[in-house]
Structures are given as structure tokens and as C-alpha cells.
UniProtKB/Swiss-Prot annotation:
Residues 142-667 are extracellular. Residues 481-618 form the P/Homo B domain. Pfam families: P_proprotein (PF01483), Peptidase_S8 (PF00082), S8_pro-domain (PF16470). This is Proprotein convertase subtilisin/kexin type 7. The gene is PCSK7. The record marks 141-142 as: Cleavage.
Length: 785
């Protein structure tokens, strides 16, 4: 067997797959440093070496500015600095990123390299600017709260049904939280010490009208029901990230409270509440109104109406207080919010409700004055509003059961606070216009949508649609104020016409001509109001419809089966917003009919009056504004660098900040009583003292003998102190009894009479005895007193 090389099984065997893989991995391992060292030449976007890097702005030394020339300069400069040119930075011409080749280096070596690079770049004539790149901390703009009930706040962020919420998270991500705005809840009080409200509480905007002190803390009651105001306040401004309960829609705003519903309420108290601290409070949230029983016709009385008007004129430095009111919860009683004077007012923002499925809840009311709707609770199978609650009595500080239009109005108030943060100079009419322009129409089988002449869709069930925080805030950011409020009031139109039963009807007309509107300049409508006086045996059987010149119909007075009042209407004002943006000129028709079964007595339209409110805007102006707002919905204007100038507000005199508290009042009453007591006591003491002096006098009325000297008194050393001042007898035989009231001389001090000069006593005698002197024998001095 010939000699040969001994076989080594492991080496002589054919290379299998595992062996090849090991060789490939070894090769890659050896190539990694080389690859990483050259990776920087691929461009700055993929750079991730972790070492120092510099941004450098170069200009061509040859003056041509060509990109190829600049690229060559950048390569040479980077090499001179011991760096690698990673390429141009984005689309910025002449800007390059220089990076240090990868490799572990001690900290001292890195610092030496940094100094060397800085020296090279600073001394090169082609370098216009350079800067070492630092790591920047950036966070994703997403909203995360640790409040335990925030995931259940579907109305803020509906994860179960995306889109069925108020669309507010994008606004929060841009740091719009209501900062700088104060919302006041006019209700039964606000528990401001609870941790969800305390950090945002505004004591300077608060007051208790029920107890007449500055603290609106709710009082426990038998029904455990005075939590209403606290719940509304939590919806607006509950503090986030405090690991407690929930989050408010405008959690950066201030929240105040006016306690007025926990006791008897008068017209004057309402008036005070509507204007209380109206240079501090921007928005008044009012989740209350007349009884929702389907038979009440009521609203603010004379003082309340005046306060609402004064608030929109002088409140908020002249931009106008924003009054947000709930439309009412009388739907199950077939009630209608046109019979609610607060919802019917042109000075308020009337807000209705929809449930989480976007449908009209069973309790919601309809009316022609409805401006918009937002979310609230529905039937028992649907979720209600999660918000802060009081922790008094049976309260736990948090609730998942807030519902009704009472829950919808505070959400609207919070969204308006977001609007005022980005545009503080919005007027009360600007807010109404933005709601009309941005509310979104949606389908509901109960809603009857009609598009008016100006292109706005409205339904009696949902107003102009659902409030959308994103649309409201973006529109507010670029909004310029509407022109002045123009109005037209017709004469009182006396009719005295019978109202027939259905299907017949009474129709009355009034034409508004161009000449009628010349004085005010009114062109397009906002609110239209009709004031009627009607007698009818059953008020709830009446149906009133108003037709604007365009033909747009408003059901301003809906029949109500539970309203059997026999007095009809006495100067009651109905209003509608359904003709918003339409032309004001033309013929208005009021159509009334009796839909009841009673035929024993006919109703009479005594008189009516038409009032138009609007502006000098034309139809073209409205269309231009619509296009402008739609262009802003991308959010391109919603950043701090863009801001339209705001006109300065009016200098409204501040309110007197001093308040008499009950304790102060009690103290003043006690001090007053004490003062009266001592005054009476002192007067009684003086009176008794004078009577005592008078009883001790011995002066008689009649002839008065004025001796020059009492010899007996002189001898006894008592001078004249024991001698009567006036006597018809000798002083030594003076009688001690008094026969009449004392005279002026009776009350003279004895030490004055003991002096040698008797002119005083003689003069006093003349004062006491003003009658003429009688001629008497020499040596006697007598007078007839």
C-alpha cells in the first residue's frame, strides 16, 4: 500500500451547509467595521452612527453655486476635518452633514476630535455656518391620561364607534385646552374643593346668591340632588392626569360657580346671576329653565331679559358674555323649547342633545330656535356622560350617569372655551355664526333636514347639526368679526281675527320693503322673532308657523296635548334661526290654526309684531366666508405662529369687589343694637337727672325778687348754693316747695350767681321774664314773670 497523506475526516469531508454558513457569518463579521465606516456616504437620512456630526452650510469658492462643485468642496472639507460627508441635507442647497466614522473611541479622544473639527470648520473660508448636531427630545402628539374613567368618556374619544364624539383630541394635541378662559356654571353650586376641580377653580368669578356670600359650595339636601352644578363643572374643566375620575373638554380653562338654584328664585336674582363678575367670567353655562312639563310658557322676566341684553353688550370687555342654555328635557311630555324664553332668546346659544348613536333621545325637545346639538345620555341600554361628581352625602366624586340636555350644554360651553383661547375677541354673535357655519349634519330617522336659501341645513330636532370641536376651533382661528347687529321692527299689527279649526287656518302677511331696511342696512337674517297676543280656550291646541320670504318654514309654536291653559298668549315672543343667512326683504307669512277637538269657543289673534335681526352681509359675503372656513379645516392655521390681530376691548368699570358676608352683617346689626341701647340709656339718664334738678328747685312763677346777697347763707358759709335763685320772699325765709316749672334762671350754675357783678343775673332775669318792668318803690327789684 503506497504511502500517502493521512486523511483527516473533518477536513477531507465535503463542505456541508453548516460549514458554509459559518464562513459567511465570519466574513460578514469582518466586513461590518468597513461597511459602517462607509455608510455615511449614502446620505444623512440613514445616518445612525451615534458619533458626533456637524451640519455645514457651504458657499462655492468659484462663485458658480453649482451643486456638483459644492459636493466636491464638501467631500474635501470633510476629509480635511477627519470626517465623512454624508451628503446634502434634504433639499437645502449647500447644506451638508459631516459625520465621524464609526468606531469606539475613548471620551478624551472624542473631545480632541471635536476641537479639531471645530477649528477646521471655523477657519475655512467656504463655511458660512456650521453647528454640531445634538439629540433632540420629541414626543408623539398623542393624548394619554391616567384618569381612570377617561376610557369611558366616549363623548371625548369614542373607541367603540370612531367618529361619534366631539372630535376634540386633535385640538388638545395642538395645546388648545381653553387656557385663559373662564366658564361659570350657574346652578345649585359647585364643590370646588374636590381634586378634579380645585386646581382650575376661580374664586374671583364665583358667588352664592342663595346665601349671599362668595362661596358657591353646594349644600346637602334631603333628596341628595345638589350635585348638578358640580357635574356640569367637571364636564367643562376637570383636571387631567391626577389619577382621579375623568377629564374636562376644556381642562385648561378656569371654572367658577354661581349658586342660585338651591332656594327661592326671583327675577332680580336671575338678573344678578347673568351679570355677576361679567368682566371675569367669559361663558355662562345654564343647564336649567322653566318646568319641562309640556304645559308651561315661561322665561326670563323683565330684569332677566335686561340682564341678558346688558351681558352681551357690556360683558367680557364689550365682546359680550356667552350664554349657553339647555333646550330642555320635556320631550316625553311633547314639550317644545320655543315655549322656553331662555332657549327662545336671541342672546343665548340653545343646545340640544343626541345619544351615543347619534339619535334624538326620548327626553329631547324640538324647536325652531335650536342652534345645535351635542352628545349626552340616551335610554338605559346606552352610555351616559362620565364626569366629576360631588363627594357629599351619597356622592363618590365621580359618576357615569350624567345625562339630559343638562349634560349637553356644558360640553358646548367647553368647546366655546376652546374657541376663545385661539380667538379671544370673538363676539357673542361671532360664536353663534361659527356654530351655524361649522355644525355637521348627520342622518337620524327622526330628523327632518331642510336646506335654506343660504345653504345652511337645519332641523327642528338637531338645529344646524352636531358640534365638532375641531371645526369650531379651526374656524375661530381665522374668523373676523361679523358686522354690527342690524334690526327691523314692524308696527304692532292689530288683527282681531278668528282662528279656524284644522284643516283651515288663519294667514296674516307683512311685507318688508327695501325702504324699510334702508335705515338699518339689514340685508341677511340671523334671528327672526314674532310676538303674538292670542286668546284661546285651550292654548295647547294652537299651531303657529312662520314662512320667511324664501319660503323656509319654521314651526314656532307646536301643539302640546298637556297644555290646557285658557289664557292663550299675552305678548309672547317666538323665534327661529332657520332663515339664517337668507335675504331679509320680502313678505313674511304667519299661519295659525286650531288642531284641537273643542269647537265651543274660537280663538282670536289680537295682534302680532315682526322683528328681524341680522347684518349688512350680502349673500356673496356669506358664501365667501363658507369657503374660507372650509379651507381652514385641514388645521394649517392652527399653530402659534398664526394669529389675526384682535381689537382692544372696552374699558368697563370693574365691579365693587367688597361683599358684606352674613357674619359681617350680623356683627353690624349687633353693634347697631348696642349703640341704640346705650343711646336710649344715656337719654333716659339725662332726663331723670334734669327732673331731679327741677324737683329740687324752689323757684316759683310770679313776681321774682333778686337779692344782691344772702346774708344768712353768707354767714353759714354756703354762699348762694342753698339759696333759691328766684323768690318773692326774703332768702332767709325761703319756702322749699316748687310751684311751677323751672325757668332759665333756675338752671343757672350757683357759682355764676355768687359773683359780685349782678348784670348776669339781671340779664337772665330779663330772659326769664320778657315782660315789661313795673314801677316799684325804691329799694325793691321785682318783675312780673
Amino acid at each position: 500500500m503506497p504511502k500517502g497523506r493521512q486523511k483527516v475526516p473533518h477536513l477531507d469531508a465535503p463542505l456541508g451547509l453548516p460549514t458554509c454558513l459559518w464562513l459567511e457569518l465570519a466574513g460578514l463579521f469582518l466586513l461590518v467595521p468597513w461597511v459602517m465606516g462607509l455608510a455615511g456616504t449614502g446620505g444623512p437620512d440613514g445616518q445612525g452612527t451615534g458619533g458626533p456630526s456637524w451640519a455645514v452650510h457651504l458657499e462655492s469658492l468659484e462663485g458658480d453655486g453649482e451643486e456638483e462643485t459644492l459636493e466636491q468642496q464638501a467631500d474635501a472639507l470633510a476629509q480635511a476635518a477627519g470626517l465623512v460627508n454624508a451628503g446634502r441635507i434634504g433639499e437645502l442647497q449647500g447644506h451638508y452633514l459631516f459625520v465621524q466614522p464609526a468606531g469606539h473611541r475613548p471620551a478624551l479622544e472624542v473631545e480632541a476630535i471635536r476641537q479639531q473639527v471645530e477649528a477646521v470648520l471655523a477657519g475655512h473660508e467656504a463655511v458660512r455656518w456650521h453647528s454640531e448636531q445634538r439629540l433632540l427630545r420629541r414626543a408623539k402628539r398623542s393624548v394619554h391620561f391616567n384618569d381612570p374613567k377617561y376610557p369611558q368618556q366616549w363623548h371625548l374619544n369614542n373607541r367603540r364607534s370612531p367618529g361619534r364624539d366631539i372630535n376634540v383630541t386633535g385640538v388638545w394635541e395642538r395645546n388648545v385646552t381653553g387656557r385663559g378662559v373662564t366658564v361659570v356654571v350657574v346652578d345649585d353650586g359647585v364643590e370646588h374643593t374636590i381634586q378634579d376641580i380645585a386646581p382650575n377653580y376661580s374664586p374671583e368669578g364665583s358667588y352664592d346668591l342663595n346665601s349671599n356670600d362668595p362661596d358657591p359650595m353646594p349644600h346637602p339636601d334631603v333628596e341628595n340632588g345638589n350635585h348638578h352644578g358640580t357635574r356640569c363643572a367637571g364636564e367643562i374643566a376637570a383636571v387631567p392626569n391626577n389619577s382621579f375620575c375623568a377629564v374636562g373638554v376644556a381642562y385648561g380653562s378656569r371654572i367658577a360657580g354661581i349658586r342660585v338654584l338651591d332656594g327661592p328664585l326671583t327675577d332680580s336674582m336671575e338678573a344678578v346671576a347673568f351679570n355677576k363678575h361679567y368682566q371675569i367670567n367669559d361663558i355662562y353655562s345654564c343647564s336649567w329653565g322653566p318646568d319641562d312639563d309640556g304645559k308651561t310658557v315661561d322665561g326670563p322676566h323683565q330684569l332677566g331679559k335686561a340682564a341678558l341684553q346688558h351681558g352681551v353688550i357690556a360683558g367680557r370687555q364689550g365682546f359680550g358674555s356667552i350664554f349657553v342654555v339647555a333646550s330642555g328635557n320635556g320631550g316625553q311630555h311633547n314639550d317644545n323649547c320655543n315655549y322656553d324664553g331662555y332657549a327662545n332668546s336671541i342672546y343665548t346659544v340653545t343646545i340640544g342633545a343626541v345619544d351615543e348613536e347619534g339619535r334624538m333621545p326620548f327626553y329631547a325637545e324640538e324647536c325652531a330656535s335650536m342652534l345645535a346639538v351635542t352628545f349626552s345620555g340616551g335610554d338605559k341600554m346606552l352610555r351616559s356622560i362620565v364626569t366629576t361628581d360631588w363627594d357629599l352625602q351619597k356622592g363618590t366624586g365621580c359618576t357615569e350617569g350624567h345625562t339630559g340636555t343638562s349634560a349637553a350644554a356644558p360640553l358646548a360651553a367647553g368647546m366655546i372655551a376652546l374657541m376663545l383661547q385661539v380667538r379671544p375677541c370673538l363676539t357673542w354673535r361671532d360664536v353663534q355664526h361659527i356654530i351655524v357655519f361649522t355644525a355637521t349634519r348627520y342622518e337620524d330617522r327622526r330628523a327632518e333636514w331642510v336646506t335654506n336659501e343660504a345653504g345652511f341645513s337645519h332641523s327642528h330636532q338637531h338645529g344646524f347639526g352636531l358640534l365638532n370641536a375641531w371645526r369650531l376651533v379651526n374656524a375661530a382661528k381665522i374668523w373676523t368679526s361679523v358686522p354690527y347687529l342690524a334690526s327691523y321692527v314692524s308696527p304692532v299689527l292689530k288683527e282681531n281675527k278668528a282662528i279656524p279649526q284644522s284643516p283651515r287656518s288663519l294667514e296674516v302677511l307683512w311685507n318688508v320693503s327695501r325702504m324699510d331696511l334702508e335705515m338699518s342696512g339689514l340685508k341677511t337674517l340671523e334671528h327672526v322673532a314674532v310676538t303674538v297676543s292670542i286668546t284661546h280656550p285651550r292654548r295647547g291646541s294652537l299651531e303657529l308657523k312662520l314662512f320667511c320670504p324664501s319660503g323656509m318654514m319654521s314651526l314656532i309654536g307646536a301643539p302640546r296635548s298637556m297644555d290646557s291653559d285658557p289664557n292663550g298668549f299675552n305678548d309672547w315672543t317666538f323665534s327661529t334661526v332657520r332663515c339664517w343667512g337668507e335675504r331679509a326683504r320680502g313678505t313674511y307669512r304667519l299661519v295659525i290654526r286650531d288642531v284641537g277637538d273643542e269647537s265651543f269657543q274660537v280663538g282670536i289673534l289680537r295682534q302680532w309684531q315682526l322683528t328681524l335681526y341680522g347684518s349688512v352681509w350680502s349673500a356673496v359675503d356669506i358664501r365667501d366666508r363658507q369657503r374660507l372656513l372650509e379651507s381652514a379645516m385641514s388645521g394649517k392655521y392652527l399653530h402659534d405662529d398664526f394669529a389675526l390681530p384682535c381689537p382692544p376691548g372696552l374699558k368697563i368699570p370693574e365691579e365693587d369687589g367688597y361683599t358684606i358676608t352674613p357674619n359681617t352683617l350680623k356683627t353690624l346689626v349687633l353693634v347697631g343694637c348696642f349703640t341704640v341701647f346705650w343711646t336710649v340709656y344715656y337719654m333716659l339718664e339725662v332726663y331723670l337727672s334734669q327732673r331731679n334738678v327741677a324737683s329740687n328747685q324752689v323757684c316759683r312763677s310770679g313776681p321774682c325778687h333778686w337779692p344782691h346777697r344772702s346774708r344768712k347763707a353768707k354767714e353759714e358759709g354756703t354762699e348762694l348754693e342753698s339759696v333759691p335763685l328766684c323768690s318773692s320772699k326774703d332768702p332767709d325765709e325761703v319756702e322749699t316747695e316748687s310751684r311751677g316749672p323751672p325757668t332759665t334762671s333756675d338752671l343757672l350754675a350757683p357759682d355764676l350767681l355768687e359773683q359780685g357783678d349782678w348784670s348776669l343775673s339781671q340779664n337772665k332775669s330779663a330772659l326769664d321774664c320778657p315782660h315789661q318792668h313795673l314801677d316799684v318803690p325804691h329799694g325793691k327789684e321785682e318783675q312780673i314773670c
